[in-house]
Amino acid sequence: MINLSKRLQTIADFVTPGSRICDVGCDHAYLDIRLLQQETIPSALAMDVAPGPLSIAQQNLMLTGLLGRCETRLSDGLAGYKKGEAGTLVIAGMGGRLMASILSADPDKTESFRELILSPQSEPWLVRGCLSLSGIGITDEKCVEEDGKYYCVMKAVPGAPCIRPDWGAVLQRIDEMSDEELSQAGVERGSIRRILSSEPFRAGVEAEYGPCLIKNADPCLKKQLLGALKSRISVYNKLCEQTDPGVAAKTRMQVLRGEIGRMQALTFALCYAI
């Protein structure tokens, strides 16, 4: 049986058993092969825009004796897909901008799937924004660390509400904390309440980091956030050491202050209030 990377295995775990998948950007069809070998799915449609990867996918399917259960198709995004051919759409291994363009190119096709399993390599906020505009709710999400990088894997369902953090409960938890507890956490009650009560803050962090990941206080997200926060503070401190910073440096410092403040507030919420 073929072995999957941690990220691909997380994607596989999100697929509803018995659902035929349409794997866009299938690369070598490893995901399709594993799901078929496990009998998780009855059949699959593997599509890729490049002939090379599709040819390798066909070879892998032949070697595993699964070519009859997985159709391969040359397609730019969902251009070669017909509505109703699959219940689950899987897109992974590409940037968020390209993924969002595929999802928005033909809304009828995108919304015809019962579920979407998506794992952008970058700019996940663009994918989350695209889903929100299309009325496709994120119902589950995992953060995966692989080879020193962090990836999100999200499950979304057309017409379903997006699972979001209970910010009201977060504020209630802050109200229940003593001044000593808040001091040990490095925050001031009024200040942290104002930040976490802000709708722009909530919308921003949910888009950037994932509403489900925040709601579940995902341990991998915490690790990712702490690493990113440390990196930004380091850059900010180096800029502060400049004796005569120019306009570009001052602008960068202002941006970093905002980013660091938001990240610190979210880190507090994840570690103490969610």
Where are these regions (language model features)?
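Conserved S-adenosyl-L-methionine
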Residues: V24-G25
